[in-house]
Amino acid sequence: FRPDRSHAKSARSVAETMGNYHPHGDASIYDTLVRMAQPWSLRYPLVDGQGNFGSPGNDPPAAMRYCLTGDALVRLPFGQSMRIGDVAPGARTNSDNAGELKVLDRHGDPVFADRLFHSGDHQTFRVQTAEGYEVTGTSNHPVLCLVNLAGVPTLLWMLIEEIRPDDYVVLQRAPPVESGPANWRDAMEALLLGAFISEGFMSESRAGFNNVDRDYFNAVVAAYDAVVGGKRYVAQRTIASGSVLNELDIHDVSALKGTRLGVLCGQRSADKSVPEWLWQSPAAVKRVFLQALFEGDGSCSALPRNTIQVSYSTRSRQLAIDVQQMLLEFGVISRRYRHAVGEYKVVITNRAQAELFATQIGFGGAKQSKLTRILGSLPPCAGMDTNHVPGLAAFIRSHCDSEWVDKEWLRKHNIDRLSRWRRDGAEILSRIANPDVRAIATDLTDGRFYYAQVTSVTEAGVQPVYSLRVDSEDHAFLTNGFVSHNTEARLTPLAMEMLREIDEETVDFIPNYDGRVQEPTVLPSRFPNLLANGSGGIAVGMATNIPPHN
């Protein structure tokens, strides 16, 4: 905990103090640590805190120990992601695990995570949004939310236990920075994976794939020959609809099992999911997978009133969750729900997101041409994006300090929709006189975030939980698209003067409460903390206060 070393997780400081010197609960220890880090509480702070340690206005500090379940996907650079439980394989319960991993912060910029904490088993809760996005963590895990603070839409950290239905959580949706084209073999395996998950099967003795799009079918067969090779059979037959169905049949699956597609062997439709190797692949590889997947079981259609829908259907709940999450990694917002027939659907239901899907991902065959035609046939202003910043319009109209003519323009126009800001942002800002209001509006509408409405916070059982230590100013990282947070601390140089030469027989030591270690009776304290920072207390009915001295 020395000031010349990196910050340590607050929970670790509390745990060591409680284990060695104070076996009476952790709350009082953490409260003391927080107070010693607050410059408004102590004239000379003794703890150098990193993260949320409260505010002079009595905003509470973040919790010392808050963590996520092991299945939470941590965003990495170049479109890669990893389960937080896989960051340090074999990590023991209640352990700190050093390492170096680049993760993305709340803005989508790369920062270093140098430690994984396995925090043991704790009661967890699942936060789910109206679109179906979800994250699971301990009750005191903080995520970034959009809060109406005295009429001002403000980004604030909220604990899961504080989040209620109709609150708004922040999802990071900046498209990934890509490092170049995909490795050809990885891309071919991703193409085969998407095709076989959607339109194929693989048992212990046989595998197959079929599709009516001849060009798409030929691409899958070519990928199979390049990655797997060996004897396979192709055929055609006319089905009831009159379409020609192209079929690939594989009788010997031993070579196929030897590839990364072997995870599909014997998998039931309801059990399908995205394998971990694909999550850890860069965006270019994931794009090939999604193109093949949507070309198989995906669809696009023009709907009444100049609207459009892109959808994917599956029998697997987990696959639907995975597809929605992977779309979010490309910045595409979708909605997930269970259809009446028992299938799970992932749908994109507005023009802006359909256009983003078409440019960032797209279908892998003839369906892409159909999507392009539908989008091209829509009137210029049809199907505007419904994504908005809750409370922004009312805030601007109330605090813009503009002339009457500009106020009237702001009142008549829809100024909380992100599509409006993308198109007319400069004009909206020109009609806002207050520079602070302009700054807040610009920050909330730059497109990095999606503000998702919470529908439920439910118990998810006792599970192993994990956290990361991130070396950045706000110590934030992305999990399932949600923005997560942490706190850490270390001693200040001034506090070291209270401990200086403590190991050179300057003070007496006695056994601690259980006799395992020694503890000092007093501190050497070259820095007179009692006088400099003051103190207060009450005993035998009398209050005593020592004011701080310079």
Curated annotation (Swiss-Prot):
Residue ranges of domain DOD-type homing endonuclease in the record: 192-332
Catalytic activity: ATP-dependent breakage, passage and rejoining of double-stranded DNA
Alphabetized PROSITE patterns for the sequence: INTEIN_C_TER (PS50818), INTEIN_ENDONUCLEASE (PS50819), INTEIN_N_TER (PS50817), TOPO_IIA (PS52040)
Active site per database record: 66 (o-(5'-phospho-dna)-tyrosine intermediate)
The protein's name in its UniProt record: DNA gyrase subunit A
Major subcellular site: cytoplasm
Lineage: Bacteria, Bacillati, Actinomycetota, Actinomycetes, Mycobacteriales
Location relative to the cell: Cytoplasm
